[in-house]
A protein has these predicted regions:
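Short, acidic, small-residue-rich periplasmic hinge/interaction motif at the N-terminus
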Residues: 32-36, 41-48, 77-81, 91-136, ...
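Short acidic/polar hinge/loop motifs at secondary-structure boundaries
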Residues: 62-65, 184-211, 299, 516
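N-terminal periplasmic accessory domains that precede
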Residues: 92-98, 143-146, 165-168, 195-200, ...
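Extracytoplasmic beta-strand/coil segments of soluble accessory domains associated
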Residues: 144-185
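Flexible loop and strand-edge segments within Gram-negative outer membrane beta-barrel domains
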Residues: 277-298, 306-367, 373-391
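Membrane-embedded beta-barrel scaffold of Gram-negative outer-membrane proteins
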Residues: 368-380, 479, 487, 520-572, ...
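Gram-negative outer-membrane beta-barrel transporters
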Residues: 447-449, 548-552, 572-654, 732-739
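C-terminal beta-signal and adjacent terminal beta-strands/loops
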Residues: 494-495, 596, 645-654, 678-740
Length: 740
């Protein structure tokens, strides 16, 4: 056997050595503003269709073994530049390659031609880019209202009283996806119920939605995917930006942004947001407010520093919010009004972050360090239920990245630390938690540009509450053809359940929480396939995206409100729990300046509640989406129209309640229509729109609203809209810097 292996090695080398017996040498340059050649260090140089390659040195020089056959194609690539392909013969002359920057071309395409929401062609992980143009197709007052034109993310009310909204990704609650702001984990813990409303729409530059497991360098928590928000940058062109909004329900908002160039190396930006709703509205006459009344003040200051050896971003945010709901007469001045049912949530939140990067002499080599601190103080009551929470959160992530042999092989390694302190009080029960999680990770990327990419990562973390655990993850991207891209992912995620904070909507019931046992960490595997096909149709490109994702829980914390009419039982999973999600989406420019998207998603989500495997409650079986966006010539007007068809979802069982409080087993199918018209001027934009134009609302969303302190009161079985049609109008003003 050993002789055969030795013979095979010798025979293989006899064939391989002559193939790379000669060398090709050359230089790679770019042109500066004066059209003079400048060396381009770290450029990728490789033979087309192979993994044989190298990287240019600090002088732009490269040397590479050359195949013996004629007409071999040498590919030169560099991020931010257009690839060049050179046909090599057997002469011994040195090559000179000048790469052209594609920055100008990309800027034009993004501003004028790129769709508002699209799957990035170049990203390893299937990532939907929701651009600023897409965000402007609806009112988009905050992050929770930014997915109206998106098929992947569902946003629903979590109860009929507080106005809180929750997202679902891959058919599962948003707590299983990782919410980030500029790739920093955010809105976990006490912010999980209302955090989506803490990001004003006017602050956002773009949103990235990726499904399945993420990179290990972002942590261990992501199970179903990531939603990352990019704020507007201090170095952008917005000298002054103002957005004013109001609707017929009495909600008004004001936003102001300004970026300032302090010095050649320093830029800063300030953001301000104020919103208010004080009108009492009860359209369904159940004596409960359809929308809460609230006031929010939100401030943000960020800085950007850039030099040849270092780049840094720093910021501080502060939020103060007070929202109230409950019975309409609770807010009257009549005697005894305060004996009625009311809710109040007071929130003070402070965030501070820093992101610093250090560029080393070796090409494509850097050190990055991210730090974040969050203070969150919440004081609430829901009728007779009183809940107070305090959280201190600290996150630190140190990363080193370089390449091995050439830039086709990149290695990233680092260490992270997460600290969470919780002090919670629910009625007469106190809960506190100190959690420390140090961890290390490494990640390897193998990239054959325009053909194949592999990302393999693993991290090891130690939690002082749950011990040691390992998180492996794998991503693949293969260009089957230039028009067909296949992506695959697999990996595991883990998270600590925050039972009360993540389920504040259940405090709008008469039931009491009962935690039956010591709760384990939630853990799950996620697997996914994503296929993108581009088709040239009538001179325009149609994109078709088809995907399948499966989530298998190893352990899940079950919130069971179906096996006791008096209690909400909380316990670890004992059985199966999984989610299968299938989605197809087609996008096409039907006629010039008219973009059309048609999508359909099917959810198969099952969990073991008690000892029975059943459909997870309040998850739509399917969703259909149809959007049309048309801009007139020279973009003087824009018309946007969105239709959502929401399939049935299982309603938690009400069989243990008196017959008059029974609800149907499944919700009906319903349709939502949204539309907006925008008029553009040089510095001004005026918009007029309508939400829920079908005026569809959930019938009788509250069980026993006439006796809110009685044993059957429940405002948490929400599957549809609570508010009817809303007409809104607004104005945007933009004054740009002449030059930054």
């Amino acid at each position: 056997m050993k002789v055969k292996i030795l013979y095979l090695i010798i025979l293989t080398n006899l064939f391989i050595l002559p193939v790379f017996s000669q060398k090709v040498q050359g230089y790679v340059f770019e042109l500066d503003k004066e059209q003079k050649k400048q060396p381009l260090p770290g450029a990728n140089v490789f033979w087309a269709g192979t993994s044989n390659g190298t990287a240019t040195d600090t002088e732009g020089f490269f040397e590479l073994n050359k195949p013996s056959h004629d007409h071999a194609d040498l590919v030169i690539s560099y991020i931010g530049y257009r690839n060049d392909t050179v046909d090599i013969d057997h002469n011994d002359g040195k090559l000179e390659v000048i790469l052209a920057s594609n920055a100008t071309l990309d800027e034009v395409e993004i501003a004028e031609r790129a769709p508002g929401a699209h799957i990035s062609r170049t990203e390893l992980i299937a990532t939907q880019q929701i651009t600023l143009g897409e965000l402007k197709k609806a009112a988009c007052c905050n992050l929770s209202e930014s997915f109206e034109t998106n098929a992947s993310v569902d946003v629903n009310y979590s109860d009929a009283i507080t106005g809180a909204k929750q997202i679902k990704l891959l058919g599962l609650s948003g707590k299983y996806s990782q919410l980030q702001t500029e790739n920093i984990p955010n809105f976990q813990g006490l912010a999980s119920s209302y955090g989506l409303s803490y990001v004003p729409g006017s602050w956002m530059e773009s949103i990235q939605v990726s499904k399945g497991t993420s990179s290990v360098k972002n942590g261990y928590e992501s199970i179903t995917g990531q939603i990352n928000v990019e704020y507007k940058k201090p170095e952008n062109k917005e000298k002054l930006y103002v957005n004013l909004y109001g609707n017929q329900a009495g909600r008004i908002e004001g936003n102001i942004n300004s970026s300032i160039r302090v010095s050649p190396k320093w830029n800063t930006a300030v953001f301000g947001h104020v919103s208010n709703q004080s009108t009492l509205i009860d359209h369904n006459n159940d004596n409960f407010l359809d929308d809460p009344i609230f006031t929010q003040v939100n401030l943000f200051n960020r800085w950007h520093y850039h030099s040849e050896k270092m780049e840094g971003m720093f910021g501080v945010k502060y939020l103060n919010e007070e929202r109230k709901g409950g019975q309409v007469d609770y807010y009257s001045n009549e005697p005894g009004a305060k004996d009625l049912y009311g809710t109040e949530i007071k929130t003070n939140r402070l965030e501070a972050f820093s992101k610093t990067g250090f560029f080393l002499k070796r090409p494509e080599t850097s050190i990055g360090w991210i730090n974040s601190y969050i203070f969150h103080d919440m004081n609430t009551y829901f009728g007779n239920n009183k809940y107070d929470g305090l959280q201190h959160h600290f996150y630190s992530n140190l990363m080193f990245q370089t390449y091995i042999s050439n830039t086709a092989h990149v290695i990233t390694a680092g260490a992270s630390y997460v600290f969470d302190y919780f002090d919670e009080n629910l009625n007469d029960s106190a809960f506190s938690r100190n959690e420390h999680v140090p961890g290390v990770f490494t990640e390897y990327t193998w990239n054959l540009p325009e053909k194949f990419t592999l990302l393999a990562g693993i991290r090891a973390d130690w939690d002082n509450l749950y011990g040691f655990f390992v998180t492996p993850r794998l991503h693949l991207r293969y260009n089957i053809t230039k028009q067909t891209v296949l992506r695959a992912s697999a990996g595991r995620g883990s998270r600590t359940a925050n039972v009360i904070a993540e389920n504040l909507s259940l405090l709008t019931t008469s039931r009491r929480f009962v935690i039956k046992e010591k709760l384990d960490m939630e853990k799950a595997w996620n697997y996914g396939l994503h296929l993108t096909q581009y088709i040239d149709l009538l001179g325009k490109e149609m994109s078709i995206n088809a995907e399948f994702y499966r989530t298998d829980f190893i352990n899940q914390v079950i919130i069971d409100k179906e096996h006791s009419p008096d209690h909400i039982m909380v316990y670890n999973l004992d059985g199966k729990s999984y989610a299968n999600t299938y989605q197809v989406e087609v996008s096409y420019e039907l006629i010039p300046r008219m973009d059309v998207t048609l999508a359909f998603r099917y959810n198969d989500v099952m969990m073991t509640i008690g000892d029975t495997l059943m459909r997870e409650p309040l998850v739509n079986r399917y969703k259909g989406l149809f959007t049309v966006s048309y801009a007139t010539n020279l973009r003087k007007w824009q018309f946007d129209f969105t239709t959502q068809v929401n399939g049935p979802s299982r309603i938690p069982s009400t069989e243990d309640l008196p017959e008059e409080y029974h609800m149907e087993s499944y919700s009906p199918v319903y349709t939502i229509l949204n539309a907006q018209i925008t008029k553009f001027y040089k510095k001004w934009e005026f918009y007029l729109g309508g939400e829920n134009l079908t005026n569809y609302t959930q019938h009788n969303p509250i069980i026993d609203p006439g006796d809110p302190f009685g044993p059957y009161f429940d405002a948490s079985n929400i599957w549809g809209p609570i508010s009817g049609v809303k007409i809104y109008a607004g104005v945007r003003f933009l004054l740009k810097h002449d030059k930054l």
